[in-house]
UniProtKB/Swiss-Prot annotation:
Gene Ontology CC terms: membrane
Residues glycosylated per entry: N56, N85, N99
Name this polypeptide is given: Sodium/bile acid cotransporter 5
Membrane topology annotation: Multi-pass membrane protein
Length: 438
């Protein structure tokens, strides 16, 4: 009888101990929602706080749902004073999605006991041999060789339309430039941070959104200013000014928001790319100004082709952005797409509202809005690629490409609506004139 009671008591104690163990969480993995793999060889780092009398008694078991997509090579184990770290080495085969289950087991003699299990860690495998900075090289070289002279010619044509007197006016009354700078470097980064926290983006993606929002004006803002009857001379001046300010404000914002997001490390600002962007605008525009004063007949020809050329470049730019960013669309989730739509829309709204409150002329209001909403997102891409390891950089780079694509689509929609409205007004006015004459 005593022996039976002892056995029952022993089983009860074991059951209580197992229940206590199952209620604890020993495994710690950096991210359990979704993992993006782009290289042939990848690793998953798992930390275990489980302790036993024998340190080597615990081990990991990894179960992969689809071995055609992902295969495990081995699991390396490293014991430290406060935790046991496991490195799961994997190789990727095909593109696709699969689920990974990770189990922590404890060996006691010939018996094994399941301590904890992390189920259904989703893994997306995207074959991408090159880095994102090399991605544009996959675009047809013939298109690039054709588009580059057209861009330079277009900037030169803008130089022919510039009135130098306007520079003096802006210098005396720099309010539009100040409004654009405040919106771009203070309000937009804060909005990007706030939105990324609301939708609970991972730290790397949130930083990508913030860096996109702290970029200077660009993205063909002067093209859209011309097509929407804004002040394109002011747009060029605002782009150049904000690009210069980016040399100071991008490092400041990257430091502030990386610390808030808990990201450590050194963030590299692509100074050479910022300067080259500035020169890429100033040199052809300056040539256009010289042509206007030295060869007026050539300048008048360039002014005539500027609108059709701007339309062509706008469509080609959207096409190239989608071509380069296609790989990122595969990794986009609903939250990132939503932010991609909101960021340019908020920039346009803030810029236009502030300019309207300051009672600026309508063309100036349009220009401030465009320069605040159309950001040079590819500078953010350069910052991310230079600052993060490749796996984290791929995740963070989704935001700049998504914002660039959404910006182009939104501006195209605005231009089409604006042109349609303008044509309807012209048609109605023409009809009224005819009725009046009759």
């Amino acid at each position: 009888m005593i022996r039976k009671l002892f056995i029952v008591l022993l089983l009860l104690l074991v059951t209580i101990e197992e229940a206590r163990m199952s209620s604890l969480s020993f495994l710690n993995i950096e991210k359990t929602e979704i993992l993006f793999f782009t290289k042939t060889e990848e690793t998953i780092l798992v930390s275990s706080s489980y302790e036993n009398k024998r340190p080597n008694s615990s081990h990991l078991f990894v179960k992969i749902e689809d071995p055609k997509i992902l295969q495990m090579v081995n699991v390396a184990k490293k014991i430290s004073s406060d935790a046991t770290n496991f490195t799961i080495n994997l190789v990727t085969d095909e593109e696709g999605e699969t689920n990974v289950t990770i189990q922590l087991w404890d060996s006691e003699g010939r018996q094994e006991r399941l301590i904890e299990e992390i189920k259904n860690v989703k893994v997306k495998v995207l074959k991408q041999k090159d880095s994102l900075l090399q991605a544009p090289m996959h675009i047809d070289r013939n298109i690039l060789m054709l588009i580059l002279p057209l861009i330079l010619l277009n900037k030169c044509a803008f130089g022919c339309k510039i009135e130098l007197q306007l520079f003096q006016t802006v210098w005396k009354r720099p309010l539009p430039v100040i409004l654009g700078a405040v919106t771009q470097f203070f309000l937009m980064p804060f909005c990007g941070f706030l939105l990324s926290q609301i939708v609970a983006l991972p730290e790397a993606q949130a930083f990508g959104v913030v860096m996109t929002c702290t970029c200077p004006g660009g993205g063909g803002g002067y093209l859209f200013a011309l097509l929407l009857d804004g002040d394109f001379t002011l747009a060029i001046l605002m782009t150049c000014t904000s690009t210069l300010l980016a040399l100071i404000m991008m490092p400041v914002n990257s430091y502030i928001y990386s610390r808030i997001l808990g990201l450590s490390g050194t963030f590299h600002i692509p100074v050479s790319k910022i300067v080259s962007t500035l020169l890429f605008i100033l040199v052809p525009v300056s040539i256009g100004i010289v042509i206007k004063h030295r060869i007026p007949e050539k300048a008048s020809f360039l002014e005539r082709i500027i609108r059709p050329l701007s339309f062509i470049l706008m469509f080609v730019g959207i096409y190239l952005t989608f071509t380069v960013g296609l790989v990122f669309l595969k990794t986009d989730n609903l939250e990132v797409i939503l932010l991609g739509l909101l960021v340019p829309a908020l920039g346009l709204l803030f810029g236009y509202s502030f300019a309207k409150v300051c009672t600026l002329p309508l063309p100036v209001c349009k220009t401030v809005a465009i320069e605040s909403g159309m950001l040079n997102s590819f500078l953010a891409l350069a910052v991310i690629q230079l600052s993060f390891p490749q796996s984290k950089a791929n995740l963070a780079s989704v935001a700049p490409f998504t914002v660039a694509m959404c910006s182009g689509c939104e501006m195209l929609l605005i231009i089409l609506v604006y042109k349609a409205k303008k044509r309807c007004i012209f048609f109605l006015q023409d009809k009224r004139k005819r009725n009046f004459l009759i």
